[in-house]
Amino acid sequence: MMAAALGPPEVIAQLENAAKVLMAPPSMVNNEQRQHAEHIFLSFRKSKSPFAVCKHILETSKVDYVLFQAATAIMEAVVREWILLEKGSIESLRTFLLTYVLQRPNLQKYVREQILLAVAVIVKRGSLDKSIDCKSIFHEVSQLISSGNPTVQTLACSILTALLSEFSSSSKTSNIGLSMEFHGNCKRVFQEEDLRQIFMLTVEVLQEFSRRENLNAQMSSVFQRYLALANQVLSWNFLPPNLGRHYIAMFESSQNVLLKPTESWRETLLDSRVMELFFTVHRKIREDSDMAQDSLQCLAQLASLHGPIFPDEGSQVDYLAHFIEGLLNTINGIEIEDSEAVGISSIISNLITVFPRNVLTAIPSELFSSFVNCLTHLTCSFGRSAALEEVLDKDDMVYMEAYDKLLESWLTLVQDDKHFHKGFFTQHAVQVFNSYIQCHLAAPDGTRNLTANGVASREEEEISELQEDDRDQFSDQLASVGMLGRIAAEHCIPLLTSLLEERVTRLHGQLQRHQQQLLASPGSSTVDNKMLDDLYEDIHWLILVTGYLLADDTQGETPLIPPEIMEYSIKHSSEVDINTTLQILGSPGEKASSIPGYNRTDSVIRLLSAILRVSEVESRAIRADLTHLLSPQMGKDIVWFLKRWAKTYLLVDEKLYDQISLPFSTAFGADTEGSQWIIGYLLQKVISNLSVWSSEQDLANDTVQLLVTLVERRERANLVIQCENWWNLAKQFASRSPPLNFLSSPVQRTLMKALVLGGFAHMDTETKQQYWTEVLQPLQQRFLRVINQENFQQMCQQEEVKQEITATLEALCGIAEATQIDNVAILFNFLMDFLTNCIGLMEVYKNTPETVNLIIEVFVEVAHKQICYLGESKAMNLYEACLTLLQVYSKNNLGRQRIDVTAEEEQYQDLLLIMELLTNLLSKEFIDFSDTDEVFRGHEPGQAANRSVSAADVVLYGVNLILPLMSQDLLKFPTLCNQYYKLITFICEIFPEKIPQLPEDLFKSLMYSLELGMTSMSSEVCQLCLEALTPLAEQCAKAQETDSPLFLATRHFLKLVFDMLVLQKHNTEMTTAAGEAFYTLVCLHQAEYSELVETLLSSQQDPVIYQRLADAFNKLTASSTPPTLDRKQKMAFLKSLEEFMANVGGLLCVK
């Protein structure tokens, strides 16, 4: 009650002293003084009706920070006390603030902006009950603009910007405690008329300035402000008419806003003079990089114009044709500035992605042709500049960003064969593809690492450890270039082949020369590293482009040979000699050109052969002890390509295609020598890599991924197991022989997965038995041998014992990852034996966090991969094992003091995994492919006992075990906290009937968790807890037990939610969740609700506030009398609650 207790001069003195403290350097004031000063301002801003005091402060104080706080206090109080204020006093307050700013041109910018924001908030709050409109403000602003005084014009711009910012978004708007729906409604009203008015005022200013020849600095500054304002208007995210509150937030969070105005904007934006003005403005200011960004952004927004503004297709065609003409006139024949690249590419990208294809093709054909030629020229030019940026290692990669956008635009165009005939874009595709290849090859064929003047850049290129792999970093670019390569396959496939063949011949020659030098004089050889490095880099890019051209990266789908590649091979198959093709494919050690008739081979297979030849040169260098000269990156590229290729082409399933190329089906089809040979070759490559490159983790990882590809499809696995070296690999891995035992844990895990998948290939019973004996049995035997030693407890911390245990646990994760519906029976039974032993290991290794973590991970993997296939008795076995694991974990960790941050971090990791385990178990309730243990017939002695325990029971029991471990400190880890509350909410929503049946301690812990989440956690967690309350209250209403613990708990929550909605300032996004919970709780406890309202009203001393509150509550209650769990009534209540919150929401948060 600060303002009421003291006179204005005393208030000013107190605030100015507090401001001095806050502005003082940290060395001059202590924490306590700072907090006291902050408290003074907070208390001042919450004081009741501070308007007179604030006016006095604004007129007399000279301290900027105090002025800023006075403006903020006015803004907050106006909204808070809106229903208590007379219309006249609000109007005079608004006039006072505007006049105040006009009369003080030298105000600090942040103070002026805050005062104008207060004006905008007053206008916004008044727009809804029609008590204030923008007309008078626009009239004032219009006069300010026409004054011709730059300072006054700048102020006019600030007023319009404040209005725009306040109305533009319901999420970025001032936090004035009103609902999303309120902000959405204000925005809709504003965007129809007032926004257009602002745009018209802005356009007038821009027209005036664009006509002037010379602008001084002050004029330029005004021009820039209005251009930025135009950009703000054109980037407005127009709200559609009937969007619910949930969607408003989603709609407004979209990053790239396209221009979709309502019909009422038709006359304004379809006037061709508006578009021409923005092109004129850009031509005038393009050399000023800051202004050019705004003008290009305005044009990019106009290029995205769509929606009801166009009355018909004809108007769209006219607009687009006009725009493209303007664009070509602006950029043809000029040297594009760095600052223009991204803007121009955004304009082109918007034109291509926003305008329907039939509109694009309806513009005059010459104009369209010029547009595509311009796109081709810009793509090649930006590509070259992007390569230069890479060489110069620039921080701001503007050309790279622009190039990416243009390549995406190409992808949109060339994938449309409905509107463009085949071959329409071939010549353009050739140009863009050639330019990409040229930028990525070393001189003399290419321009890689050449600076602008053609000089080679720095010799040694440092590659950071953290740098992303090119194939990931440039995956979008490569996908677009690969697609363009397919469009122009006639040119691109032979080009890649000749470039690769020529480089692999040079690489072979270089390595041979070096070998001869070594033999002639060991130890004295010098290597031309520059030449080798250039070759490796060239081969790297050529393999990446080939991989993206020949195959797609499909996640979870069956990859198909791209139709363009299939058609290209079929078209030329009559010119192809199959035998020569097979000979070239099967002779990676030979130069293609040394094989008679080599020009009559299938071009796609010859391109594959070129890469197999790279692989062969690498293998021969390894055999010749030249590994130190090889590039691990090239090794990675080779196996990455072979994996990608094998997934798509190897043992091609002819049923998936209308027609198939004869060379493909002969070389890689089912039951062919070619496929058997290739599988043998790839397998040998895998084995060689795992021996030679075991220390190169990324390369080893790519290698085992290739192995998984060879066995994940049964048809391929059938051929793999016929190779003798597959069995040798399995034996070698099972016996933990070097060098396989040196592989990193993730690689060993994936290798185990591959070996298990291979075991489900087609074999006779005896062979299959022998295979499992050689792959899985040694794992079991060695594990049991280690843990059953008498002195295992004493030896368990020895390094070799720990390594054995870790390797086994990693292998178990790999086995679980190999689960499929047809192998789950064997794998589950095998893994269950281990799970029981793993629980014993938890005891032994309770003080070895990384082992504990890995044991939990085994359970997580088994549950994740297998639970959905398990019938009741098997699921029970797994539930029991998981609960025993949690019991042991809980017992070992309860009451344990976590001394340092590392220990806390470790427990955080454990608990995160346990949350994942419980969530995986809970998924059984939704995803269940089991057929009463059907998949286990023949593997299951005896019948399941008649037990019926649901996944929910198990998960709740699991929660009970870990709840005591969830300390306040651990809940400070946001990820863990969110996971924990998501799990609890999930259970309450899906199984509310289980909650009342919980043991008393668990029930209390759960209720305490919900209360903690609502009162002390993030708004996201609070929302989750509110969402959990609704189903619990509904469950209570169904059960009609008025003395149950849940009934009593919900009564307590009614008070919490009531206080949150009425007495506390809360995040308005939570109003919906809080409202739904509140309504359900009110239905359940109507008498208590009336009591809460009465208590609140009786505490009000101010009769005006009392009456307003009483009216608001009566209106709220009347919306659903008596409240019942009926959807219609609930919706009516929620709507009234929105209104209630708008009117009295902040009224009681006053000091």
Swiss-Prot record:
<dbReference type="InterPro" id="IPR044189">
    <property type="entry name" value="XPO4/7-like"/>
</dbReference>
<dbReference type="Pfam" id="PF08767">
    <property type="entry name" value="CRM1_C"/>
</dbReference>
<dbReference type="InterPro" id="IPR016024">
    <property type="entry name" value="ARM-type_fold"/>
</dbReference>
<dbReference type="InterPro" id="IPR011989">
    <property type="entry name" value="ARM-like"/>
</dbReference>
<dbReference type="GO" id="GO:0005634">
    <property type="term" value="C:nucleus"/>
</dbReference>
<comment type="subunit">
    <text>Interacts with Ran and cargo proteins in a GTP-dependent manner.</text>
</comment>
<dbReference type="InterPro" id="IPR014877">
    <property type="entry name" value="XPO1_C_dom"/>
</dbReference>
<feature type="modified residue" description="Phosphoserine">
    <location>
        <position position="521"/>
    </location>
</feature>
<keyword id="KW-0539">Nucleus</keyword>
<dbReference type="GO" id="GO:0005654">
    <property type="term" value="C:nucleoplasm"/>
</dbReference>
<feature type="modified residue" description="Phosphoserine">
    <location>
        <position position="464"/>
    </location>
</feature>
<dbReference type="GO" id="GO:0031267">
    <property type="term" value="F:small GTPase binding"/>
</dbReference>
<protein>
    <recommendedName>
        <fullName>Exportin-4</fullName>
    </recommendedName>
</protein>
<dbReference type="GO" id="GO:0046827">
    <property type="term" value="P:positive regulation of protein export from nucleus"/>
</dbReference>
<comment type="function">
    <text>Mediates the nuclear export of proteins (cargos), such as EIF5A, SMAD3 and isoform M2 of PKM (PKM2). In the nucleus binds cooperatively to its cargo and to the GTPase Ran in its active GTP-bound form. Docking of this trimeric complex to the nuclear pore complex (NPC) is mediated through binding to nucleoporins. Upon transit of a nuclear export complex into the cytoplasm, disassembling of the complex and hydrolysis of Ran-GTP to Ran-GDP (induced by RANBP1 and RANGAP1, respectively) cause release of the cargo from the export receptor.</text>
</comment>
<dbReference type="GO" id="GO:0006611">
    <property type="term" value="P:protein export from nucleus"/>
</dbReference>
<keyword id="KW-0653">Protein transport</keyword>
<dbReference type="GO" id="GO:0005643">
    <property type="term" value="C:nuclear pore"/>
</dbReference>
<dbReference type="GO" id="GO:0005049">
    <property type="term" value="F:nuclear export signal receptor activity"/>
</dbReference>
<keyword id="KW-0597">Phosphoprotein</keyword>
<keyword id="KW-0963">Cytoplasm</keyword>
<dbReference type="GO" id="GO:0005737">
    <property type="term" value="C:cytoplasm"/>
</dbReference>
<keyword id="KW-0813">Transport</keyword>
<comment type="similarity">
    <text>Belongs to the exportin family.</text>
</comment>
<dbReference type="GO" id="GO:0005829">
    <property type="term" value="C:cytosol"/>
</dbReference>
